[in-house]
UniProtKB/Swiss-Prot annotation:
Compositional bias segments (type: Basic and acidic residues): 171-190
HAMAP family the record matches: HSV_GH (MF_04033)
Origin superkingdom: Viruses
Protein name as annotated: Envelope glycoprotein H
Signal peptide: 1-18
Transmembrane segments: 804-824
Subcellular location: Virion membrane; Host cell membrane; Host endosome membrane
Reported modifications of this chain: N-glycosylated, O-glycosylated, and sialylated.
Amino acid sequence: MGPGLWVVMGVLVGVAGGHDTYWTEQIDPWFLHGLGLARTYWRDTNTGRLWLPNTPDASDPQRGRLAPPGELNLTTASVPMLRWYAERFCFVLVTTAEFPRDPGQLLYIPKTYLLGRPRNASLPELPEAGPTSRPPAEVTQLKGLSHNPGASALLRSRAWVTFAAAPDREGLTFPRGDDGATERHPDGRRNAPPPGPPAGTPRHPTTNLSIAHLHNASVTWLAARGLLRTPGRYVYLSPSASTWPVGVWTTGGLAFGCDAALVRARYGKGFMGLVISMRDSPPAEIIVVPADKTLARVGNPTDENAPAVLPGPPAGPRYRVFVLGAPTPADNGSALDALRRVAGYPEESTNYAQYMSRAYAEFLGEDPGSGTDARPSLFWRLAGLLASSGFAFVNAAHAHDAIRLSDLLGFLAHSRVLAGLAARGAAGCAADSVFLNVSVLDPAARLRLEARLGHLVAAILEREQSLVAHALGYQLAFVLDSPAAYGAVAPSAARLIDALYAEFLGGRALTAPMVRRALFYATAVLRAPFLAGAPSAEQRERARRGLLITTALCTSDVAAATHADLRAALARTDHQKNLFWLPDHFSPCAASLRFDLAEGGFILDALAMATRSDIPADVMAQQTRGVASVLTRWAHYNALIRAFVPEATHQCSGPSHNAEPRILVPITHNASYVVTHTPLPRGIGYKLTGVDVRRPLFITYLTATCEGHAREIEPKRLVRTENRRDLGLVGAVFLRYTPAGEVMSVLLVDTDATQQQLAQGPVAGTPNVFSSDVPSVALLLFPNGTVIHLLAFDTLPIATIAPGFLAASALGVVMITAALAGILRVVRTCVPFLWRRE
């Protein structure tokens, strides 16, 4: 090409396989000669309009073949968007020395024209590239046409056109975290390295997994090669357009989000790109590269200096972290602090479990906030911990070339739990909009794994009856997250919840970690159908009963004990040897329809049960309120209520009400009781007597109708007999409340044994969940909408008859019978005689 022409060719690189070649950075000295000309490349300095190239007319018989393809729809409006790439074409920009007065020509050449063409004999022969001993770079920034005087104005970053992704460079250049890696501790000061496979340990193919492998998942190792994604070439594009594309060897990614937030993490060899965006806060981006790499910021085309490096903390022994975001100390100090902490996470551990344990603790340790509102700082921290967990999991699996089965199932299960908690509890998302996509497994291998696990789900529930086996089956269904898996385990999960309720009524405390874990996954299985759309009638009925049982399991004593258990568990957790797994501390309150656990009465009850501690009282009270708020946010599913308790959200014409439900009791398949602090305009309403006037309580029986009227609660003394006959209470709900307006228990009378337990009252030495030493009022809520104030059960004695009296009575009956027989005989004899005489 002659000296009078300048040619700029851009080749966009996508995902490709193979490890034989990679990107290498080459500097054209011509670029440097023209740096001073960049400031002159504005076509119209008055309006700041970007320079636009000319394109051939597709109808031109000579040059139409070089016109932009029709699918790009390039116009003067779309050309500045830089969407020039078409998969079937290469584009070439030809300009002259008169640039920018001559805007140049943007030409498109089909790739098919370039394939298989013979070499031009007039061109000098290129030397063959010999083999190189240098391994391919893990991370290479593709600066492309940076500071090219012929293209920098055209390819000017949108970050300099519309916004700057790092407005406060000094604010985003902060010191390294306290737990970050050092030369002495290159994997983090508090790192607990994940175990590797012992020498000689076999690697099991996923197609051969059995129930025995599931029971011994902690010593069952799978081959990473073939199960994980094979590293492939990939170009990471920063959404902020503040840095140039980065070439990496991708190993997968993790994404989760909802209607109010989105998190995307891209993993690679020595690389992680994390983007966090929310509806209620500006976006943030974290980029992790090897310690010896730098990422240049896309500079102003008129700047003659070399581009600046992206902000972030100083490099560590293994990685360097760059930060892009808008928060500044002046306007959002908490968000900036959260971003600083997120930037330190990738260097603090190589063990995925440590990150997940810390994420659970972050969720429970956050200040209560206000209801279900979004809290960006908490969401950023949870997203950073979850993304760093995936980064550590993938890196450890590739380093060991093996994956422990328990780690694989644990990572997938806890990722789903944490994504849901972060989305609903921190981002304010609608529950039915939450999604999670973990793409670190090879797609074909994942299908084989899911098929095998789906087979084992049905087998383990069919062949084994232990609680451990059933909890494992429910966890597998939760990991698979498919309608088929949920349908296979849902009947078993419903029976398990009923069985645990029977044990609870018998006085057993459901506090063992295995019981809590089984209850966690069982309730998750029953709630799952509402995420897939409208549940069937069977699914709705099963879920309604499950919600009713978990609400019954959540008494005031259970709620207070849950606070104490969570505080104690968090206090002894160091996230190294002692990890915190939330399913092992699960409370039925978190899956119930009780939304009153953050009220003052429950907080005082929880503090009363607190053991002696050096923690200041105000700090303990704040922690308790935080845990109570978490339980409420965890359980508060507006979408779930609409799906399974639609009568509670039924819309009627006329004035609406803002009464927030405190407790929901789905007592039949189409009717529910709701407890509120203000009366509702529809349904059968009852005002509870003897309650503090500052916190009144109302109970309303709701159906799908819009009529409403009030009734009085009638006090009654019920009668029980000593022959244990049916009392007509099966299906009713026993509700106990205090004068302070605290509902202590909402217990379902589900069987004859339960109604007999209620009627008989407390027995010495045997716990009875229906009784209470606290001054309170007991109500019975019946399925037909009737509510009575239960005063007591009166015993109706059975009359005692002496044996002698029975013998005399029998003799009297015999004598009377004989007399009647004699009289009848006389009548039969006399009547014919008198008839003949007449």
